[in-house]
Structures are given as C-alpha cells and as structure tokens.
Amino acid sequence: KKNTTIGEGTHVASLKDGIDANKFYNNKKKDSTDDTTPKAVTNYNSTMTELNYNDKAEYTVKVDKEGLYYLNLDYISIGESLSDYTVKLAVNGKQQYSEMNTIALPIIWADEDTKTYVGSDKKKSFPLDSYGDEIAPSQNRVQEWTNTYLHNNTYVSSLPLSFYLKKGVNKITIENVSSGGLAVGKLQVEAGKDNTKSYKEYASEHSNAELVKDSADALQVDA
C-alpha cells in the first residue's frame, strides 16, 4: 500500500560517533601520509564522519507525525575522487524502494579562473583558441561543504526523494557505495510536500481553455 501521508515539521538528526570537524582535520594531519584532506573541512559547525567504500553513517531522528519526509544532507569530498559519489540509504533497516540504492552526491566543479567576469553585467570572459574562438575554461574540483536534498542518480523528478518515517524515533543509515574520500555531516529531516492538484483545481486553472473539436487536432492515447 502506497503511503501518501505528509509528515510534519523540520528535525535535525543525531549522528552516531560524529566528530568535530577541527578535531577530524587535526587527526588526519597527524598521519604524515595524508596530504589530501582540504582545510575547508574545518569550516563547519556540526559533527561529521568520513565514509570510505562500504562505510556507513548512522543517524537517529524523532518525529511527532508519521508520514513522508525529505532528507537534506551536508557533505564534502575530502579525497581525490573525480566522480560523483553514490550512497545507499535505509530507514529503520529497510529500503522502501529501489531508488534508495543509488542516491547521488555530486562533485562540484568551477572554472579554474573565477576572476574573469568583467563589467557590471557580470559578462564572462572566456579563453580563446588559436583561431580566436572561445573555448571552455579548465575546471577545478570544489572541495567545500555542500548541502543538498537527496535525489536518485537518474534525476527522473525535480522533487527530492520522499522517505516514510514512523512516529517516534527512526534510524537512518547512509552507506557509501562508490569511491572513498566522502565525509558527511548534518542530516535534516523536513516534511514532504504534496504538489498534486485536485481535478477541481486543475479545471479551474484551465477554465478558459479552448476545447479540441477537430478530430485532426485530437491527441490519441492508449489507455
């Protein structure tokens, strides 16, 4: 049975065994072999944890109403991966649908030279090739804390994935199923939204629409 009940409120989940970002960075730098963790990881005021391949982060959150919720996650790339991260998610030990197996956490890229905007209209100046034609600038990976709603990696919908939470305490597990060097932080749970319009609302919005009377203009569908 499909659950369509919408949850209520915004809640911050608690991260099991989370560590202060500055402490994490200092611990990494004590290992002389580590030279990839960016200083930007310390620009964070919540607890965090590192997820290498198949590592899991466990969160608990209490909600006052059962229903559908969006999940909003902070993350940062602290390794050398050039590909988007993929994580798998479970709620109370279960996966509610297959899309929870492949949730995307994108790597962020920016132009190598970010100071090439000129004029009040913010027009960008692109590098030129030997023929004087504009070419795409080189890209750098941005290693900063990023906040995102959780989407499946196919992005079949512009809306985030919805997760059913029971009333009371829920355990949310996030597993890294891609490359190492991923760190995650605060997980926020927000009530989902029902954007489905009723027939009455839809009809009211299109009350002035012209009916198709010519069969040549009619759209035929198989039902």
Description of each model-found segment:
Residues 1-223:
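Extracytoplasmic
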